[in-house]
């Protein structure tokens, strides 16, 4: 898919040098899990983003793909599509439960098999099932999201990863096929106002919960979560065709970027930055900075359900609300 990436001579020498050094340090790494956001962990070389597509043939799209993510969204390039329907969320009327997990790269929430959570509408032609929620954040406020809007980053980004359950049986199969994945992305700002925090994220980031996943592989079970509370009361969205922003960088993703940011408190953000990407037996390294650098948008189309020529207009009406379980007027 796309052929082998070609290296300049100096870059090739650097790559083979670090790979040779890595081969002499400890046991051989698992090739399917040998990647990081930083090139050096615990004194060992681990491939960072510039090397993802070079160290594993199955990840070649990370280096040579033409529809990679994340991207910088310039609002002047967004094409207004008045025919985009509203987003719909289905939970079967049940509360969400699942496991909050420190993967060593992200804060991850893995929903339990039941209830099944689906998203549809917007640019999606099929119903997509929620597989995972990821939280990415930076070491400093205003720089932690993967995507940017008009060259501006946000303190964090929440990504809801879904697979097309109508065409594929699981996330792995969907990641290899057309119309396979849908990722809803919500941006997060840090508020200096006490208590000004998104209610869903507050359930994940309160002190009693977040301290249960301080180290890599720590996990904590949560229940009675209302996923619809993650979304703003009204919002627009921007969509484009892209890729997974982690290896194997499969170009099967419909991205949907919610254009109204959420808030969390400075204390909640501080708690996130205290999470370690290592187990407790190893030196502390903050989980922050867990995003891929921006990729070229090139000639891909950006579509939105709000007219960028009139950004001052408020999002009003049912098209700018999340429709929960098919309710005609949103939540």
Curated annotation (Swiss-Prot):
Pfam families documented for this protein: Carb_anhydrase
GO cellular component terms given for this protein: basolateral plasma membrane; extracellular region
Major location (coarse): secreted
Keyword Flavoprotein: no
Keyword Secreted among UniProt keywords: yes
Chain intervals with Basic and acidic residues compositional bias: 322-331
Residues of the signal peptide: 1-23
Domain Alpha-carbonic anhydrase stretches: 33-306
GO molecular function: hydro-lyase activity; zinc ion binding
Subcellular location: Secreted
Disordered: region residues: 303-331
Glycan-linked positions: 118, 170, 189, 263
Keywords: Glycoprotein, Secreted, Signal
CDD domains, per database record: alpha_CARP_X_XI_like
Similarity comment text for this entry: Belongs to the alpha-carbonic anhydrase family.
Role according to the record: Does not have a catalytic activity.
PANTHER family: CARBONIC ANHYDRASE (PTHR18952), CARBONIC ANHYDRASE-RELATED PROTEIN 11 (PTHR18952:SF93)
The protein, known as: Carbonic anhydrase-related protein 11
């Amino acid at each position: 898919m796309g052929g082998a990436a070609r290296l300049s001579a100096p870059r090739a020498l650097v790559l083979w040098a670090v790979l040779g050094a890595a081969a002499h340090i400890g046991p051989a790494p698992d090739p399917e899990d040998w990647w990081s956001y930083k090139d050096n962990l615990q004194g060992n070389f681990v491939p960072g983003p510039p090397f993802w597509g070079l160290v594993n043939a199955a990840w070649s799209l990370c280096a040579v793909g033409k529809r990679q993510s994340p991207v910088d969204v310039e609002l002047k390039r967004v094409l207004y599509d008045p025919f985009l329907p509203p987003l719909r969320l289905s939970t079967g009327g049940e509360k969400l439960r699942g496991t909050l997990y420190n993967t060593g790269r992200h804060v991850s929430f893995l929903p339990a098999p039941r209830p099944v959570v689906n998203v549809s509408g917007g640019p999606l032609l099929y119903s997509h099932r929620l597989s995972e929620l990821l939280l990415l954040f930076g070491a400093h406020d205003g720089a932690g999201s993967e995507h940017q809007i008009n060259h501006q980053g946000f303190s964090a980004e929440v990504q809801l990863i879904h697979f097309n359950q109508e065409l594929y049986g699981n996330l792995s199969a969907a990641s290899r096929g057309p119309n396979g994945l849908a990722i809803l992305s919500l941006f997060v700002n840090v508020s200096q106002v006490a208590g000004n925090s998104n209610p869903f994220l507050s359930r994940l980031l309160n002190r009693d919960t977040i301290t249960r996943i301080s180290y890599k592989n720590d996990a904590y079970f949560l229940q009675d979560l209302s996923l619809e509370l993650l979304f703003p009361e009204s919002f627009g969205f921007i969509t484009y065709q892209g890729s997974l922003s982690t290896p194997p960088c499969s170009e099967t993703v419909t991205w949907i970027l919610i254009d109204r940011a959420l808030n969390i408190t400075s204390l909640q953000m501080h708690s996130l930055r205290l999470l370690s990407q290592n187990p407790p037996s190893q030196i502390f390294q903050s989980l922050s900075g867990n995003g891929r650098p921006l990729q070229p948008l090139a000639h891909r189309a950006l579509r939105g359900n709000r007219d960028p020529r009139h950004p001052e207009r408020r999002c009003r009406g049912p098209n700018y609300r999340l429709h929960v379980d098919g309710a005609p007027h949103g939540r």
